């Protein structure tokens, strides 16, 4: 049995509302899906959160556009502080769909990478979970 130590953190589950709040606070997340031949794929992307869905700008020739449309995907957002040994992680699961339209309102994600991204990959989130760790001290 392991004893309590100040170097260990306390892990807490986040509520769905807390998960959505944290997800909307970061500019980059990780899109994950099962690619060809059952091989996992994970890429970092810029995104926005709008009305219970995740919006990602992508190019028609991108791996995500070719492999994610009408498919189950996962999306992960996190942040951490190594010095404080603290952070949080939010995981979303759902289905991705390609759209030509922009997200409603002024919610188009700012894309850091160059190139033309005329498509929107929209993830309809079916499940959202999260955890937060605080330093035990």
Question: Where do the language-model regions lie?
Answer:
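A generic structural motif
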Residues: 49-51, 100, 129
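N-terminal short leaders/motifs
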Residues: 1-5, 46-49, 74-79
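A generic local structural motif
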Residues: 15-18, 41-43, 60-62, 107-109
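Extreme N-terminal tail/first-helix region
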Residues: 1-24
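General beta-strand recognition
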Residues: 53-55, 122, 129
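Short, structured beta-strand-loop surface elements
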Residues: 60-119, 125-127
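Short, charged, intrinsically disordered terminal tails
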Residues: 12, 128-137
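Short beta-strand segments
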Residues: 26-59
């Amino acid at each position: 049995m392991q004893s309590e130590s100040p170097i260990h953190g306390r892990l807490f589950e986040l509520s769905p509302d807390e998960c959505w709040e944290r997800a909307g606070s970061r500019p980059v997340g990780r899109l994950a899906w099962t690619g060809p031949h059952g091989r996992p794929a994970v890429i970092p992307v810029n995104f926005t959160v709008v009305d219970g869905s995740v919006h990602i700008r992508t190019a028609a020739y991108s791996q995500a556009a070719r492999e994610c449309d009408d498919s189950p995907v996962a999306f992960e957002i996190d942040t951490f502080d190594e010095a404080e040994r603290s952070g949080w992680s939010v995981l979303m699961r759902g289905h991705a769909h390609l759209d030509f339209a922009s997200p409603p309102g002024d919610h188009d994600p700012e894309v850091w990478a160059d190139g033309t991204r005329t498509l929107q990959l929209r993830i309809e989130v079916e499940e959202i979970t999260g955890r937060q760790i605080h330093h035990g001290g």
